[in-house]
Regions:
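Conserved ABC ATPase signature
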Residues: 142-146, 150
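Conserved ABC ATPase "signature" region
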Residues: 121-138
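Conserved catalytic motifs of ABC-family nucleotide-binding domains
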Residues: 163
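Conserved ABC transporter NBD signature motif
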Residues: 64-72
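Short coil-to-helix segment of the ABC ATPase nucleotide-binding domain corresponding to the Q-loop/switch region
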Residues: 102-110
Length: 242
């Protein structure tokens, strides 16, 4: 194996992967620098989710390599990849997948609680993120009492609460109305920038690219284009105490 470029915190080389014999990735390569926001755009079925799952260690590609901080991920055993995801990565998908028996703040704080952070400290950090996502007033509610847009914001808070090195966001605003979608993406990307987090943000909406530094466009499992975003939307400034 040839080591990836030193300035890439996340790197993939010629990834190939199939689902039940159907090709999902056909030789995709990408590098992401520390603190960078990369938008992965393309229509449904283009390979976006498969790429994010390979990069985050959820899937081992059929062929190709995945590296994080200069160490190979694709050769690690399942337990090591699970540990990497818990300790260094955050994930939010298009479905919130909240635990119904937990309140909003407990769901948001779950990554911290699983790491042994005391309940009071975990709750305070979760509340901060819920407030930033305009869902703080519902912190004590269970998912069944929340609107769809509110549940999705709780899921975003959960992905950010532990300040992971990399946040993988797989079409996180897909189920939301346009105004809610824009607010969630602005908050996600501005919070990541203020904390130095790297983000890989997938979306079917071309507007997703407005929030990123670079865009990787996929189609039919292949790279269609890779460009820098010249006129991305300027994110809202982060609070001074963030």
């Amino acid at each position: 194996m040839v080591a990836p470029p030193d300035n890439d915190v996340l790197f993939a080389r010629t990834l190939r992967h199939s689902h039940r014999g159907s090709p999902a990735l056909l030789g995709v390569s990408v590098g992401v620098r520390e603190g960078e926001i990369l938008a992965v755009v393309g229509p449904r079925g283009s390979g976006k989710t498969t790429l994010l799952r390979c990069l985050s260690g959820q899937l081992v590609p059929d062929q190709g390599e995945v590296w994080f901080n200069g160490a190979p991920v694709h050769t690690q055993p399942a337990a090591a990849r699970d540990h990497l995801r818990r300790e260094r990565f955050g994930w939010v998908g298009s479905e919130p997948q909240l635990l119904p028996e937990l309140t909003a703040w407990e769901n948001a704080a779950l990554p911290l609680l699983m790491r042994g952070v005391r309940s009071r400290a975990a709750r305070a950090q979760a509340q901060e993120w819920l407030d930033r996502l305009d869902i703080g007033a519902a912190a004590r509610k269970h998912p069944a009492r929340l609107l769809q847009s509110e549940r999705q914001r709780v899921a975003v808070a959960r992905a950010l609460v532990a300040t992971p090195a990399v946040v993988f966001a797989d079409d996180p605003a897909a189920p939301l109305h346009r105004a809610d979608r824009a607010q969630v993406l602005r908050t996600l990307t501005s919070a990541a920038r203020s904390h130095g987090m790297t983000v890989v943000l997938a979306g079917t909406d071309p507007d997703t690219a407005r929030y990123a530094d670079r865009t990787l466009a996929l189609r039919d499992g292949r790279t269609e284009s890779a460009t820098a975003v010249q006129d991305r939307e300027t994110p809202d400034p982060a609070p001074a105490n963030a």
